[in-house]
Swiss-Prot record:
Residues 483-523, 552-567 have a biased composition (Acidic residues). PROSITE patterns: ZF_C2H2_AKAP95 (PS51799). Core component of the DBIRD complex, a multiprotein complex that acts at the interface between core mRNP particles and RNA polymerase II (RNAPII) and integrates transcript elongation with the regulation of alternative splicing: the DBIRD complex affects local transcript elongation rates and alternative splicing of a large set of exons embedded in (A + T)-rich DNA regions. May play a role in neuronal differentiation and is able to bind DNA and activate expression in vitro. One of its GO terms (biological process) is regulation of DNA-templated transcription elongation. Component of the DBIRD complex. Interacts with CCAR2; the interaction is direct. InterPro entries: AKAP95, ZF_C2H2_AKAP95. This is DBIRD complex subunit ZNF326. The keyword rRNA processing does not apply. It comes from the Eukaryota. One of its GO terms (molecular function) is DNA binding. It comes from Homo sapiens (Human). PANTHER family: A-KINASE ANCHOR PROTEIN AKAP 8, DBIRD COMPLEX SUBUNIT ZNF326.
Amino acid sequence: MDFEDDYTHSACRNTYQGFNGMDRDYGPGSYGGMDRDYGHGSYGGQRSMDSYLNQSYGMDNHSGGGGGSRFGPYESYDSRSSLGGRDLYRSGYGFNEPEQSRFGGSYGGRFESSYRNSLDSFGGRNQGGSSWEAPYSRSKLRPGFMEDRGRENYSSYSSFSSPHMKPAPVGSRGRGTPAYPESTFGSRNYDAFGGPSTGRGRGRGHMGDFGSIHRPGIVVDYQNKSTNVTVAAARGIKRKMMQPFNKPSGTFIKKPKLAKPMEKISLSKSPTKTDPKNEEEEKRRIEARREKQRRRREKNSEKYGDGYRMAFTCSFCKFRTFEEKDIELHLESSSHQETLDHIQKQTKFDKVVMEFLHECMVNKFKKTSIRKQQTNNQTEVVKIIEKDVMEGVTVDDHMMKVETVHCSACSVYIPALHSSVQQHLKSPDHIKGKQAYKEQIKRESVLTATSILNNPIVKARYERFVKGENPFEIQDHSQDQQIEGDEEDEEKIDEPIEEEEDEDEEEEAEEVGEVEEVEEVEEVREGGIEGEGNIQGVGEGGEVGVVGEVEGVGEVEEVEELEEETAKEEPADFPVEQPEEN
């Protein structure tokens, strides 16, 4: 190589660097094809170093070569777009291959291939129909704005600058990508010009042009679709597509599923059918209440035996005992009078009303005592109950029946031992609990009194009481049954014990069931005001009370619920109720 050739070689190399900014070979060959050593690019004659260099570096158009003058300064003729089988974006030689390192190997590797990709995007690579990347895709114009690209950009040589921005390649059935990238088979991409996108949304099929094209995964019901509503195919995953069952815009559910709910809605809205349905519902509610009462009776009978109906109770004070002397003392005690005073203070009832309420409790006590006298087999029943309690218990079970003391304030059973009872009396929990329970009884007493007076049968009794007649006197058998039922209702308010009193009384209670439910509903109101949680807490424990000073409030709650509902149906006509409500 003489001085002139050496000078030409260095000049060509410098010129190449100035034009291209890169000093490495780009591809499988410039003008001559895949191999640069055989001189296919020359037009004849002996190859000189100048021609070799010019051909090798794509500088024929600068050094006077005739073949490459039609190409721009930044690109040589590139036959790669028409070639197939190889990776089209890979050069003919690796960066470390010896053939490439002959000329420019010392300069290679300084620039990344992303520069080449940026040049290739303007070079008409897609004009041959075999491109892997659209020249102007929506991702290049507005990257990250609408990422609805198909698999044409999933290639590792796409325009994504970071691997983290590249969506994961998915199969033909995943995330709605088409089975084959359309741009690979010659179809053109109209993303940049507002045409239908070939990219993937998060739903199935093509994105559509904002409502003009429906996605194949959506089933549109044209028969039931309203005329004034336009169907908009919104982007969303399959979960969202199945979500709107009653939205007006485009039903995404199957036709039979859509038609059935519409019929149901139309039937429910028809005024002619609402009345019978309401009647049926009311009947069901009444039956449910009575069934609930029966279950409560059975539950109480299982827990406490049939004798629990023979207990004497005071509905206002939640007092419960099996001894007549105890109830007599209670009705004459100061605690009972304090409760009545509290009721009068809160409700502002007249003295006549308070006397009537007291007489109601006395009448209940008398009725219970009469029932006990009529029960001849009470002792036998108790023995049978005792046998049932210990049924199935063997010596190996190490169980025995003992007496216990029930504390309604704490809802605790205490062994009937002096030491245990004294220890509980001095415990801080009992000291706090008895104060809270006392306040609770006062609150519930007001609600119980109001619910009793809301009972229409009790109102009739009160009218007779005001006239000076005996309100509890039995005039007719039917009236007597109603009265007994009412009294039982009152007792139910306090405890469902009296609901279960006798089979005859249960029948009477069913006849007067609505009245009983009214009282029960009223007591439920009490529970709601005071907090049903508290009432329930007092509930079962109170009913079980062996020592028998407090009635169970738990059963009262259920009765109160029924009474509340009945009370709503029957407004309070009782003249004394108005001050209560105020």
